[in-house]
A protein has these predicted regions:
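N-proximal low-complexity "stem/linker" segments adjacent to membrane-targeting elements
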Residues: 1-21
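Conserved short acidic donor-positioning loop in nucleotide-sugar-dependent glycosyltransferases
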Residues: 10, 22, 36-39, 61
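Short, acidic, metal-binding catalytic loop of nucleotide-sugar glycosyltransferases
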Residues: 20-29
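A conserved acidic beta->alpha catalytic loop
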Residues: 35-44, 83
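Glycine-rich, basic loop-to-helix element that forms the pyrophosphate-binding segment
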Residues: 57-74
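Short aromatic/hydrophobic "clamp" motif used to bind/position activated sugar donors
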Residues: 79
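Conserved donor NDP-sugar-binding/catalytic core segment of glycosyltransferases
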Residues: 87, 91-122
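Conserved nucleotide-sugar donor-binding catalytic segment
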Residues: 128-209
Length: 247
């Protein structure tokens, strides 16, 4: 069985989209866990008659703690954490993942399709480059070429929890720990769709530049003895400075 955790916050329509993408799958042995930080009862009421494990946080936990609370509830052998603004695009998404796991992989990375207004962007980079970054996951600290959390599926035995000291690069640091020293495969035919630009999007509510600096300093200290991570952070900083000079 695979557990799909859906953290939610005050957006019933996006939650419906995420949930419907799960129940339309050809693989039906799925545990759906909804961890709700909402200030309204809309999602709670909608879930009353659904075959889901629903938990409402009162008071709200905040984004990262809410994600961790969902991970702790998972009972499946495999896990996906899918935010309410994400969805599984292809109906064989889960069965394709399970095939990879049966072939001995520990982590499966899927492709990403970003929706922003009327525009759609498929993929973040060439597939060969994504495979390179996945094979050497410390490179993700230079740039996120994976996408959102739903692009990662993993065996529960290798579960990692989000570092609650982080905000902006919390997902990247989590990806690194999940993939480091594991057998990872990129499934380019599996697609996650991600809705950007909506009011509740976490990145819309952060001072990104300031938070990125705070997170980078924290990671630099956390990985004091990891030269690859530290070098990746240095390269990211160098590239950012070059881009500013060009502009």
């Amino acid at each position: 069985m695979i557990s799909i955790i859906i953290p939610t916050y005050n957006n019933l329509e996006l939650f419906k989209r995420a949930y419907n993408s799960v129940i339309s799958q050809d693989e039906k042995e799925v545990e759906v866990i909804v961890v709700d930080d909402s200030t309204t009862n809309d999602i709670q009421n909608y879930c009353l008659n659904l075959p889901v494990r629903y938990h409402h946080n009162s008071p709200a936990l905040g984004a990262v703690k809410n994600w961790n609370s969902g991970l702790k509830l998972a009972k499946g052998e495999f896990i996906i954490l899918m935010h309410h603004d994400e969805a599984l695009k292809n109906k064989n998404f889960i069965s394709s993942l399970l095939h990879c796991f049966k072939n001995g992989y520990d982590v499966v990375v899927s492709n990403i399709e970003v929706h922003l207004g009327n525009s759609v962007r498929k993929g973040l980079c060439p597939n060969w480059l994504k495979r390179l970054f996945i094979a050497h996951s410390y490179l993700l600290f230079v740039r996120n070429l994976v996408g959102p959390c739903a692009c990662i599926a993993f065996k529960k035995e290798y579960i990692k929890y989000f570092d609650e000291n982080l905000k902006w690069v919390v997902d990247l640091e989590w990806y690194y720990r999940l993939m480091n020293k594991r057998k990872v495969v990129f499934m380019q035919s599996n697609w996650i769709t991600s809705m950007h630009g909506h009011k509740g999007q976490i990145t819309m509510n952060l001072d990104i530049c300031n938070q990125a600096k705070i997170d980078s300093m924290y990671i630099f200290d956390k990985y004091e003895h990891n030269i690859k991570v530290r070098c990746s952070l240095f390269v990211k900083k160098l590239v950012s400075r070059i881009v500013k000079l060009i502009r």
